[in-house]
């Protein structure tokens, strides 16, 4: 009987890193691999997103203590060398215990110490960069990785553009023309703030909807983020608008397919998932995103007619209300069809193939 191969998947921080990692982890497991996940545990009061999402899916969950330094104070920066040494040592312990045949990094600061140690310990390293502007961790690790993949073109030298690893549900939705064919009445609006929510959208959208006559007002599903549900509920009550509110959407693919229009941030996973489903979207990039990468992500679709882009500073309740009232389904289905032409749906298979080629 052949030995079971093992992969150590490194990803953490936000859904933009975690969900592509889960797609790869699940595909490897289906092919008989033993998969361990390396992430951060967070704190008792604020556990990390990966610690909440990964263990319930049946993967062994390993942790080290490391987090980002951008925007932190001088004390955090001064302690960085000591924190790195600790994270390097913890990473070595994890790698020696797990004994992975391949290490797969999908971004987040947690991937840096373990990625470096995996190379020093002679483990093949496969990287995937989700954003159109590479993060600092992947910029460094790409120079020592065995294989590098990207979700967008021309992001890293010597990288292969394959799209984002997607959960299968995103590639199984009906074509936009079929979905839109029988739709009548008020628009179905989905507001998505990303895995952590979006305070600005939570405040702006209810005010915009209040400016639209109730008879023609869109039907709304609004994802708040785990810590913002009560504040969002108060915003809708103050605006006198009814909406379905949820902290988290479990079946995002179906929600995207059911919506006529999505108002959302422009994280890499969101943009590539919208392309895979073929959905119409108004992108409002997070203004504080590192290197303004969300704007670049959105432009990838918008430049080809696959959605609209408005900066947060330019979007007011009045402007959004006017846009929603003037938007017709014909324009939405055309946008959805254009978005779908930009899809790349085989990233997961590329990463799995690389793992199988590199495994000893």
Swiss-Prot record:
Coarse class of the protein's main subcellular location: membrane
Bilayer topology: Peripheral membrane protein
One Pfam family hit: Glyco_tran_28_C
Reaction(s) catalysed (UniProt annotation): di-trans,octa-cis-undecaprenyl diphospho-N-acetyl-alpha-D-muramoyl-L-alanyl-D-glutamyl-meso-2,6-diaminopimeloyl-D-alanyl-D-alanine + UDP-N-acetyl-alpha-D-glucosamine = di-trans,octa-cis-undecaprenyl diphospho-[N-acetyl-alpha-D-glucosaminyl-(1->4)]-N-acetyl-alpha-D-muramoyl-L-alanyl-D-glutamyl-meso-2,6-diaminopimeloyl-D-alanyl-D-alanine + UDP + H(+)
Name of the protein described by the UniProt record: UDP-N-acetylglucosamine--N-acetylmuramyl-(pentapeptide) pyrophosphoryl-undecaprenol N-acetylglucosamine transferase
Localisation: Cell inner membrane
EC number: 2.4.1.227
Gene Ontology biological-process entries: carbohydrate metabolic process; cell division; cell wall organization; lipid glycosylation; peptidoglycan biosynthetic process; regulation of cell shape
Entry-linked InterPro entries: GlcNAc_MurG, Glyco_trans_28_C, GlycoTrans_28_N
Free-text function comment from the UniProt entry: Cell wall formation. Catalyzes the transfer of a GlcNAc subunit on undecaprenyl-pyrophosphoryl-MurNAc-pentapeptide (lipid intermediate I) to form undecaprenyl-pyrophosphoryl-MurNAc-(pentapeptide)GlcNAc (lipid intermediate II).
Pathway assignment: Cell wall biogenesis; peptidoglycan biosynthesis
Residues that, per the record, bind UDP-N-acetyl-alpha-D-glucosamine: 14-16, 131, 167, 195, 249, 294
Organism: Polaromonas naphthalenivorans (strain CJ2)
Keyword tags: Cell cycle, Cell division, Cell inner membrane, Cell membrane, Cell shape, Cell wall biogenesis/degradation, Glycosyltransferase, Membrane, Peptidoglycan synthesis, Transferase
Family: Belongs to the glycosyltransferase 28 family. MurG subfamily.
Cell membrane listed as a keyword: yes
SUPFAM superfamilies: UDP-Glycosyltransferase/glycogen phosphorylase
Gene Ontology, cellular component aspect: plasma membrane
Molecular function, one GO term: undecaprenyldiphospho-muramoylpentapeptide beta-N-acetylglucosaminyltransferase activity
Gene: murG
Keyword DNA damage: no
